[in-house]
Structures are given as structure tokens and as C-alpha cells.
Amino acid sequence: MLKVLRGALCVALLGAVSGMFHAGAQDGTRTIEIHAKRFSFSPAEITLKKGEAVTLVLTSDDVPHSLVIDGLGVKGDMIKGQMTKVNVTPSKDGDFQGKCGRFCGGGHGSMRFTVHVTDN
């Protein structure tokens, strides 16, 4: 009887955890994964629509970094082995430049990221 209860509990927990990871897709929010490594972002540019809610999922593939996009109010730490979620809904169109906000070595200044926001 105890084995049956443990099995049922495991199935229930897996279902609950699975539901948490799919919540972003169910509410209509687009998710974009962005990785950082010395000395680049991948992808290096993305395109968003004005007024579109987007979740950026940030992670580092090596040392600590951060993504800063001043024109969109984005700032998120990027730590190896961790995911940082940053929500953004652009209110104006145009091109916005991002950069690494945490010194990560000699090529730090070359870490650039571009967000294109379209009106349609």
C-alpha cells in the first residue's frame, strides 16, 4: 500500500512541475532563450513586436555576465547553471542596444546585443 501511495505522489508532483514549465506558453507570452559566453550573446539579436509580452530566459555558458538593455528597462544576471527570467513588453519601436553589464574579461566591451522592435 505504501508503494502505491509513493507512486501516486510522484505522478502528482511530476504533473505539477510540468504545469509550471508550460505556464508561459499557455498565457500567450513568447519565451526567448539567450545565452552568454566570453565574449558574445547567442542569439546576438532578436526581433520583438511593440506591445508584445516576452519573457527572456537568460543563462551563462561560462563566467557570470548580465544583460542590460537601457532603452527597454532590461537588466538580468546571467549565471552558469541558472536561468534568470526577465519580462519585457516594448512600448516603442526602434533598435535598442544591449551589452554585458558585468566585467567578464578582456573582450567584455565587445559583448553587444540588439533588439529590433517593430510596429506590426
Identify what each model region corresponds to.
Residues 75-77:
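Surface-exposed loop/edge segments in extracytoplasmic proteins
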Residues 15-23:
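C-terminal segment of classical bacterial N-terminal signal peptides
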Residues 63-65, 113:
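Short beta-strand/loop motifs in extracellular/secreted proteins, especially
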Residues 1-10:
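Bacterial N-terminal signal peptides that target proteins for export
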Residues 28-33, 44-63, 82-92, 96:
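Beta-strand cores of secreted/periplasmic/IMS beta-sandwich domains, seen most often
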Residues 36-38, 52, 60-62, 71-73, ...:
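A mature extracytoplasmic/lumenal domain signature
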Residues 80-120:
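Extracellular/periplasmic metallocenter environments
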Residues 40-42, 71-73, 83-85:
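Short structured motifs
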